[in-house]
């Protein structure tokens, strides 16, 4: 999947393109939605926060379910119920942006991770995956905003909610149940959201010193930590975005990441019209998050 900054950028651009509500409250909550089920990944994952039951598996399972139509159908029911009012709608818009970008771009990231692993098997596919996403975040930030990582705080990705966390937790509880028939306590979802904020804070690296330090520490090891941190600039020899248009897909796909991102943005209007008027299976067309 694209990483956190890229999802943030996409949701902001889609919101502007589609004239979504732009109150400060809506924008904050939409950014949380833009991270999709990924916020669950952080639950009980941070150092000193690993004790007790974790609900991170439901985020991973949602990403890998063959067809997320049950999730989309539940979001459509939330629309009919007007769950959370305009704030709830903003979160759903962000979540749908997450799904649209993931299903368009994640096949490339998966394939590219395997190719990088074939060329350098010292790093497992999972760490190449993280390395590619981190570099793409750096590249997308420069492309879309003309900024370098040191000019942006990652904390903006999950801004303070000022009392709206229960609305988000209620949505996540409903879509987990719709997808897997599992009742997850709201308290654990709220805990996962807090862990996500902590994870973002720990990943914030505006000086670049964290990335430099951990990359040196992991020089002859797997990039367990450094691959999660944004580099100041990407490795020019790595072609993380496939600007050379090497074939990567089973059907001969060779698009670069920027083209895939632009395609998702171009399709956003049609996608949201389908969501508003058709059943969930017509929205997903059987395409998973990844």
Describe the role of every protein-language-model region.
Residues 1-94, 99-290:
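N-terminal leader/auxiliary helical segments
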């Amino acid at each position: 999947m694209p990483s956190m900054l890229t999802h943030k950028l996409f949701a902001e651009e889609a919101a502007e393109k589609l004239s979504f509500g732009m109150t400060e409250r809506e924008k904050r909550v939409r950014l949380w939605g833009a991270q999709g089920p990924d916020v669950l990944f952080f639950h009980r994952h941070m150092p000193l926060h690993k004790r007790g039951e974790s609900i991170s598996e439901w985020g991973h399972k949602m990403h890998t379910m063959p067809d997320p139509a049950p999730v989309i159908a539940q979001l459509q029911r939330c629309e009919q119920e007007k769950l959370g009012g305009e704030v709830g709608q903003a979160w759903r818009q962000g979540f749908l942006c997450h799904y649209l970008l993931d299903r368009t771009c994640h096949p490339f990231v998966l394939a590219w991770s395997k190719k990088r692993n074939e060329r350098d098997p010292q790093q497992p596919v999972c760490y190449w995956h993280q390395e590619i996403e981190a570099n793409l975040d750096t590249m997308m930030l420069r492309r879309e905003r003309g900024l370098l990582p040191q000019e942006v705080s990652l904390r903006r990705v999950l801004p303070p909610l000022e009392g709206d966390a229960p609305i988000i937790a209620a949505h996540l509880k409903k879509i987990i149940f719709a997808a897997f028939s599992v009742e997850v306590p709201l308290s654990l979802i709220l805990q996962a959201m807090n862990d996500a904020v902590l994870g973002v804070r720990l990943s914030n690296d505006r000086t670049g010193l964290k990335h430099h330090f951990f990359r040196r520490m992991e020089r002859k090891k797997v990039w367990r930590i450094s691959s999660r941190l944004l580099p100041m600039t990407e490795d020019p020899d790595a072609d993380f975005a496939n600007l050379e248009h090497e074939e990567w897909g089973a059907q001969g796909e060779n698009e670069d990441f920027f083209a895939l991102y632009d395609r998702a943005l171009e399709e956003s209007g049609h996608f949201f019209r389908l969501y508003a008027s058709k059943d969930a299976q017509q929205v997903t067309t059987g395409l998973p998050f990844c």
